[in-house]
Protein backbone atom coordinates (compact mmCIF):
# COMPACT_ATOMS: atom_id res chain seq x y z
CA UNK A 1 0.00 0.00 0.00
CA UNK A 2 2.80 2.34 0.96
CA UNK A 3 4.64 1.49 -2.23
CA UNK A 4 1.56 2.33 -4.33
CA UNK A 5 1.30 5.77 -2.70
CA UNK A 6 4.97 6.43 -3.33
CA UNK A 7 4.62 5.37 -6.96
CA UNK A 8 1.54 7.58 -7.51
CA UNK A 9 3.32 10.52 -5.93
CA UNK A 10 6.31 9.92 -8.16
CA UNK A 11 4.10 9.79 -11.28
CA UNK A 12 2.41 13.06 -10.26
CA UNK A 13 5.74 14.81 -9.72
CA UNK A 14 7.11 13.47 -13.01
CA UNK A 15 4.03 14.66 -14.92
CA UNK A 16 4.31 18.08 -13.29
CA UNK A 17 7.97 18.41 -14.25
CA UNK A 18 7.29 17.37 -17.87
CA UNK A 19 4.41 19.83 -18.07
CA UNK A 20 6.52 22.69 -16.76
CA UNK A 21 9.21 22.03 -19.35
CA UNK A 22 6.82 21.57 -22.29
CA UNK A 23 4.71 24.69 -21.57
CA UNK A 24 7.27 27.24 -22.89
CA UNK A 25 7.62 25.26 -26.12
CA UNK A 26 3.86 25.03 -26.60
CA UNK A 27 3.51 28.76 -25.90
CA UNK A 28 6.33 29.59 -28.30
CA UNK A 29 4.74 27.43 -30.98
CA UNK A 30 1.42 29.22 -30.52
CA UNK A 31 3.11 32.62 -30.78
CA UNK A 32 5.03 31.48 -33.85
CA UNK A 33 1.78 30.29 -35.48
CA UNK A 34 0.08 33.62 -34.82
CA UNK A 35 3.11 35.51 -36.10
CA UNK A 36 3.05 33.45 -39.31
CA UNK A 37 -0.67 34.14 -39.75
CA UNK A 38 -0.09 37.88 -39.27
CA UNK A 39 2.83 37.85 -41.71
CA UNK A 40 0.72 36.08 -44.32
CA UNK A 41 -2.14 38.53 -43.86
CA UNK A 42 0.23 41.49 -44.28
CA UNK A 43 1.82 39.96 -47.39
CA UNK A 44 -1.62 39.77 -48.98
CA UNK A 45 -2.07 43.52 -48.71
CA UNK A 46 -1.15 45.76 -51.61
CA UNK A 47 0.02 49.34 -51.88
CA UNK A 48 -3.35 50.18 -53.41
CA UNK A 49 -4.97 49.26 -50.07
CA UNK A 50 -3.29 52.31 -48.53
CA UNK A 51 -2.73 54.80 -51.37
CA UNK A 52 -5.85 56.76 -52.36
CA UNK A 53 -6.69 56.49 -56.05
CA UNK A 54 -8.03 59.16 -58.35
CA UNK A 55 -11.79 58.69 -58.60
CA UNK A 56 -13.01 57.22 -61.87
CA UNK A 57 -15.09 59.16 -64.35
CA UNK A 58 -18.14 57.13 -63.40
CA UNK A 59 -17.78 57.77 -59.66
CA UNK A 60 -17.26 61.53 -60.10
CA UNK A 61 -20.10 61.84 -62.60
CA UNK A 62 -22.51 59.95 -60.38
CA UNK A 63 -21.32 61.44 -57.09
CA UNK A 64 -21.80 64.98 -58.36
CA UNK A 65 -25.06 64.00 -60.09
CA UNK A 66 -23.85 65.64 -63.25
CA UNK A 67 -26.65 63.98 -65.15
CA UNK A 68 -29.09 66.14 -63.18
CA UNK A 69 -26.93 69.16 -63.99
CA UNK A 70 -27.44 68.36 -67.67
CA UNK A 71 -23.89 67.30 -68.57
CA UNK A 72 -23.68 64.54 -71.15
CA UNK A 73 -22.14 61.41 -69.57
CA UNK A 74 -20.09 60.69 -72.67
CA UNK A 75 -18.72 64.22 -72.61
CA UNK A 76 -17.51 63.80 -69.04
CA UNK A 77 -16.05 60.34 -69.61
CA UNK A 78 -14.00 61.48 -72.60
CA UNK A 79 -12.97 64.64 -70.78
CA UNK A 80 -11.62 62.79 -67.76
CA UNK A 81 -9.91 60.13 -69.85
CA UNK A 82 -8.06 62.82 -71.79
CA UNK A 83 -7.37 64.73 -68.58
CA UNK A 84 -5.72 61.65 -67.06
CA UNK A 85 -3.51 61.24 -70.14
CA UNK A 86 -2.44 64.89 -70.06
CA UNK A 87 -1.83 64.66 -66.33
CA UNK A 88 0.41 61.62 -66.79
CA UNK A 89 2.36 63.48 -69.47
CA UNK A 90 2.93 66.41 -67.11
CA UNK A 91 1.08 68.83 -69.37
CA UNK A 92 -1.23 70.14 -66.66
CA UNK A 93 0.04 72.40 -63.89
CA UNK A 94 -3.39 73.17 -62.45
CA UNK A 95 -4.62 69.58 -62.37
CA UNK A 96 -7.33 69.97 -59.74
CA UNK A 97 -9.64 71.60 -62.25
CA UNK A 98 -11.30 70.37 -65.43
CA UNK A 99 -13.56 72.48 -67.63
CA UNK A 100 -16.00 70.98 -70.11
CA UNK A 101 -18.00 72.71 -72.82
CA UNK A 102 -20.81 70.42 -73.89
CA UNK A 103 -21.83 71.27 -77.45
CA UNK A 104 -24.42 68.50 -77.44
CA UNK A 105 -26.49 71.21 -75.74
CA UNK A 106 -27.90 74.32 -77.46
CA UNK A 107 -26.57 77.76 -76.60
CA UNK A 108 -29.87 78.48 -74.84
CA UNK A 109 -28.72 76.16 -72.04
CA UNK A 110 -25.86 76.47 -69.58
CA UNK A 111 -23.20 74.20 -71.06
CA UNK A 112 -19.86 75.25 -69.55
CA UNK A 113 -19.01 73.17 -66.50
CA UNK A 114 -16.00 73.85 -64.28
CA UNK A 115 -15.39 70.94 -61.92
CA UNK A 116 -13.05 70.72 -58.94
CA UNK A 117 -11.89 67.09 -59.04
CA UNK A 118 -10.03 67.35 -55.76
CA UNK A 119 -12.91 68.62 -53.65
CA UNK A 120 -15.76 67.11 -55.65
CA UNK A 121 -17.51 70.36 -56.52
CA UNK A 122 -19.11 71.89 -59.57
CA UNK A 123 -17.70 75.40 -59.36
CA UNK A 124 -19.49 76.87 -62.37
CA UNK A 125 -22.29 75.92 -64.71
CA UNK A 126 -22.99 78.73 -67.10
CA UNK A 127 -23.61 79.95 -70.64
CA UNK A 128 -20.85 79.88 -73.23
CA UNK A 129 -20.84 81.06 -76.84
CA UNK A 130 -19.76 79.18 -79.94
CA UNK A 131 -18.42 80.47 -83.26
CA UNK A 132 -20.93 82.25 -85.49
CA UNK A 133 -20.22 79.91 -88.41
CA UNK A 134 -20.58 76.81 -86.27
CA UNK A 135 -24.35 77.17 -86.19
CA UNK A 136 -27.08 79.28 -84.65
CA UNK A 137 -28.69 77.47 -81.73
CA UNK A 138 -26.50 74.36 -81.96
CA UNK A 139 -22.79 74.20 -82.70
CA UNK A 140 -22.52 71.50 -85.34
CA UNK A 141 -19.73 72.63 -87.67
CA UNK A 142 -16.13 73.02 -86.52
CA UNK A 143 -12.83 74.15 -87.97
CA UNK A 144 -9.18 74.69 -87.15
CA UNK A 145 -8.69 77.13 -90.02
CA UNK A 146 -7.94 80.84 -89.54
CA UNK A 147 -10.81 83.19 -90.40
CA UNK A 148 -13.31 80.33 -90.28
CA UNK A 149 -15.14 81.95 -87.36
CA UNK A 150 -15.92 78.44 -86.14
CA UNK A 151 -15.32 76.73 -82.83
CA UNK A 152 -12.72 73.98 -82.53
CA UNK A 153 -13.34 70.81 -80.55
CA UNK A 154 -10.96 68.84 -78.36
CA UNK A 155 -8.50 69.29 -75.53
CA UNK A 156 -6.88 72.57 -74.57
CA UNK A 157 -4.34 73.65 -72.00
CA UNK A 158 -5.14 76.97 -70.36
CA UNK A 159 -2.29 79.47 -70.40
CA UNK A 160 -1.85 82.96 -68.97
CA UNK A 161 -4.09 85.99 -68.97
CA UNK A 162 -3.96 89.41 -70.61
CA UNK A 163 -6.06 92.53 -71.08
CA UNK A 164 -7.30 92.83 -74.66
CA UNK A 165 -10.14 94.40 -76.63
CA UNK A 166 -12.57 92.13 -74.77
CA UNK A 167 -11.05 92.93 -71.38
CA UNK A 168 -9.61 90.28 -69.12
CA UNK A 169 -8.95 87.23 -71.31
CA UNK A 170 -7.39 83.77 -71.11
CA UNK A 171 -5.04 82.34 -73.74
CA UNK A 172 -5.68 78.78 -74.85
CA UNK A 173 -3.31 76.20 -76.31
CA UNK A 174 -4.94 73.64 -78.59
CA UNK A 175 -3.33 70.25 -77.98
CA UNK A 176 -4.61 68.29 -80.98
CA UNK A 177 -2.88 68.64 -84.33
CA UNK A 178 -5.20 69.36 -87.20
CA UNK A 179 -8.15 69.81 -84.84
CA UNK A 180 -7.41 72.80 -82.62
CA UNK A 181 -3.66 73.44 -82.72
CA UNK A 182 -4.19 76.74 -84.57
CA UNK A 183 -6.15 78.11 -81.63
CA UNK A 184 -3.29 80.25 -80.33
CA UNK A 185 -2.54 81.76 -83.76
CA UNK A 186 -6.27 82.30 -84.36
CA UNK A 187 -6.45 84.21 -81.06
CA UNK A 188 -9.03 81.76 -79.75
CA UNK A 189 -9.30 82.80 -76.11
CA UNK A 190 -11.80 82.81 -73.30
CA UNK A 191 -13.17 86.28 -72.66
CA UNK A 192 -16.24 88.05 -71.43
CA UNK A 193 -18.91 89.32 -73.82
CA UNK A 194 -22.14 91.22 -73.40
CA UNK A 195 -23.83 89.02 -76.01
CA UNK A 196 -23.48 85.97 -73.75
CA UNK A 197 -26.70 86.88 -72.05
CA UNK A 198 -29.99 85.00 -71.68
CA UNK A 199 -31.79 88.19 -72.73
CA UNK A 200 -30.62 87.45 -76.27
CA UNK A 201 -32.59 84.21 -76.23
CA UNK A 202 -35.94 85.99 -76.19
CA UNK A 203 -34.81 88.19 -79.11
CA UNK A 204 -32.89 85.75 -81.31
CA UNK A 205 -33.75 82.33 -80.00
CA UNK A 206 -30.11 81.80 -78.96
CA UNK A 207 -27.33 83.70 -77.21
CA UNK A 208 -24.87 85.80 -79.19
CA UNK A 209 -22.04 84.10 -81.05
CA UNK A 210 -18.31 84.73 -81.20
CA UNK A 211 -15.63 84.50 -83.90
CA UNK A 212 -14.73 81.08 -82.53
CA UNK A 213 -13.90 81.91 -78.92
CA UNK A 214 -15.58 80.23 -75.94
CA UNK A 215 -16.89 83.55 -74.64
CA UNK A 216 -18.71 83.76 -71.31
CA UNK A 217 -20.85 86.41 -69.64
CA UNK A 218 -18.88 89.57 -68.85
CA UNK A 219 -19.71 89.48 -65.14
CA UNK A 220 -18.46 85.88 -64.87
CA UNK A 221 -15.31 86.13 -66.97
CA UNK A 222 -12.87 87.18 -64.26
CA UNK A 223 -13.75 84.59 -61.60
CA UNK A 224 -13.96 81.77 -64.13
CA UNK A 225 -10.68 82.70 -65.80
CA UNK A 226 -8.90 83.01 -62.47
CA UNK A 227 -10.13 79.54 -61.51
CA UNK A 228 -9.03 77.71 -64.64
CA UNK A 229 -5.93 79.66 -65.78
CA UNK A 230 -2.30 78.50 -65.75
CA UNK A 231 -2.38 74.90 -66.85
CA UNK A 232 -5.80 73.30 -66.42
CA UNK A 233 -7.62 71.07 -68.89
CA UNK A 234 -10.41 72.45 -71.07
CA UNK A 235 -12.36 69.98 -73.20
CA UNK A 236 -14.83 71.07 -75.86
CA UNK A 237 -17.17 68.20 -76.66
CA UNK A 238 -19.57 67.40 -79.44
CA UNK A 239 -21.17 64.08 -80.38
CA UNK A 240 -19.38 64.69 -83.69
CA UNK A 241 -17.98 61.27 -84.62
CA UNK A 242 -15.35 62.71 -86.98
CA UNK A 243 -13.61 64.41 -84.05
CA UNK A 244 -13.65 61.30 -81.89
CA UNK A 245 -12.20 59.23 -84.74
CA UNK A 246 -9.36 61.68 -85.46
CA UNK A 247 -8.53 62.93 -81.97
CA UNK A 248 -4.87 62.19 -81.25
CA UNK A 249 -5.45 62.10 -77.50
CA UNK A 250 -8.42 59.75 -77.64
CA UNK A 251 -6.55 57.57 -80.14
CA UNK A 252 -3.60 57.27 -77.76
CA UNK A 253 -6.02 56.21 -75.04
CA UNK A 254 -7.45 53.51 -77.29
CA UNK A 255 -3.94 52.28 -78.16
CA UNK A 256 -2.99 52.13 -74.48
CA UNK A 257 -5.88 49.76 -73.85
CA UNK A 258 -4.78 47.32 -76.58
Predicted regions and their residues:
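Active-site proximal loops enriched in glycine and acidic residues that flank catalytic Cys/His/Asp
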Residues: 238
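Cell wall/extracellular polymer interaction/catalysis modules
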Residues: 31-211, 219-232, 241-258
Amino acid sequence: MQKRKVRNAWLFISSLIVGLFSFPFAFAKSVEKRATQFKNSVSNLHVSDFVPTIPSAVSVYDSLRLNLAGLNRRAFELAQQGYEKLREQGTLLNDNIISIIDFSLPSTEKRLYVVDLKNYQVLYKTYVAHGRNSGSVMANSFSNNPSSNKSSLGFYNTLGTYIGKHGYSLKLEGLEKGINDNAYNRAIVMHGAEYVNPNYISKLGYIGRSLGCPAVASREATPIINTIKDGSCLFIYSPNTAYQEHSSILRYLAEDKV
